[in-house]
């Protein structure tokens, strides 16, 4: 069944455009975070930007070519501080997972595109995770807790991998001397 001329086709293009724009905004936000001394947050913005690219690609691949006219609204041109950018990013992710994609999934389902509906629902789950991550980072920035915790944890240098144990990240890496901006909470993903 062709999606040409359907509401689902329009929703896919809106989603492609939204994800593509989010990717660009997140790369801009990463530059600000880096300048403000938040290498980890810059890394999170870049990682999320790449994930948004994959979402855009997934939506784009459902389209069947030609010109499609859409009417949509997107965030326009404000790059703020890292805290402001985290807040804006969290709000955008919230709108996607709680409003847009569930509605787009419903429409796709009604139009008989169950596979597309499932993709909208699954990407909505990812966007909820993005929002949660941005809100956690925002809370840490606002509380001055990016490089400090209430309990002893393991910190790791993003540059050389040195691991340090303490409540506060060292001001500079004891191994490679990179500044505190490169220190983050150690995560095991193996």
Model-derived segments and their meaning:
Residues 1-190:
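Non-heme di-metal
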